[in-house]
Amino acid sequence: MAPCKPGSNPPKGRVSAAEGGARREATRRPPREAAAKRWCFTLNNPTEEEIKSLETWLVSDFHYAIVGKEVGEQGTPHLQGFVHLKQKKRLPQLKQLFKRAHWEKARGSDEDNEKYCSKEGNVLLTLGIPAKGNRSDLSEAVAAVKAGRAMTEVARDFSEIYVKYGRGLRDLKLLIGQQPRDFKTEVIVITGPPGCGKSRWAADYPGSKFYKMKGEWWDGYDHQEVVIIDDFYGWLPFCELLRVTDRYPHKVPVKGAFVEFTSRVIIVTSNSPPDAWYSEERCCVQALFRRINKWLVWNHDKFEDAPDCMKKYPINY
């Protein structure tokens, strides 16, 4: 077949280069919008269900987030929000937070957006810390420590900074970190025969956990919500156990320093009841019993509250 002459029509069934290019251009998918960490949104006429969903937002997902409730010039109530995510996300992923909201990539600094979203004073949510201008990673790590974040989180979010300045960040935490305890730590005792599931019950309890090993040191303690003292038979000094199970400020030793004890819950598992842990000739076991808030015992196939006949002294008073 002879080639087409310039200006002539292509053979039947063939498409000219120009026409093919036009078709490809028409059917080409629009480019995907680039992912970003910083977004702002507006949600008009928010429902109670949508407002309540803010309670499910996790601080671990954000460097900073703020949501304010406002009324527009036309009288339309709306939510005005800004998020600075830890991981870049595209618009479809953000729709999982608020499907009906109008989302745009944010302009200005975190502080600018903080002021804008809180201008009417009705702030429904704040998470994290707003980054200031062109703040360095070290400055952000320091701000995280000052805000009371756990050192494990600081190390995870600022790994390179932690490798370089970990000792300084830890020293800063010790100097200005956690506030002393001003609440009663809840004490849960679980007793029963070997293999009944005491350790599993403790491991399944919600919250971050620190397992206290036998010995003086609390190395690795970083203000976890729950402290587990597993398979206990009295190997902590009696006076130390009384202090950590109380409501007053107390510091525990780590190598080279002391840190505030601020855990909300202590779970003690043992094969023996609390009155068998220490000699009553030397220790006032009644003082320990009064600090116990809940005592569970194994009863054939489940854990139940210990009956009064097992309690040598009253608990939780």
Swiss-Prot record:
Residues 33-130 form the CRESS-DNA virus Rep endonuclease domain. Divalent metal cations, possibly Mg(2+) or Mn(2+). GO terms for biological process: DNA replication. It holds the Pfam family Viral_Rep. ATP binds at G192, P193, P194, G195, C196, G197, K198, S199. GO terms for molecular function: ATP binding; ATP hydrolysis activity; DNA binding; endonuclease activity; metal ion binding; nucleotidyltransferase activity; RNA binding; RNA helicase activity. A motif (RCR-1) lies at residues 40-43. It catalyses: ATP + H2O = ADP + phosphate + H(+). Its cofactor is Mg(2+); Mn(2+). Its EC number is 2.7.7.-, 3.1.21.-, 3.6.1.-. A motif (Nuclear localization signal) lies at residues 5-40, 87-107. A motif (RCR-3) lies at residues 116-119. GO terms for cellular component: host cell nucleus. The keyword ATP-binding applies. Keywords: ATP-binding, Covalent protein-DNA linkage, DNA replication, DNA-binding, Endonuclease, Helicase, Host nucleus, Hydrolase, Metal-binding, Multifunctional enzyme, Nuclease, Nucleotide-binding, Nucleotidyltransferase, Transferase. Essential for the replication of viral ssDNA. The closed circular ssDNA genome is first converted to a superhelical dsDNA. Rep and/or Rep' binds a specific hairpin at the genome origin of replication. Introduces an endonucleolytic nick within the conserved sequence 5'-AGTATTAC-3' in the intergenic region of the genome, thereby initiating the rolling circle replication (RCR). Following cleavage, binds covalently to the 5'-phosphate of DNA as a tyrosyl ester. The cleavage gives rise to a free 3'-OH that serves as a primer for the cellular DNA polymerase. Interacts with the capsid protein; this interaction relocates Rep into the nucleus. Belongs to the nanoviruses/circoviruses replication-associated protein family. This is Replication-associated protein. It comes from Pigeon circovirus (PiCV). The lineage of its organism: Viruses, Monodnaviria, Shotokuvirae, Cressdnaviricota, Arfiviricetes.
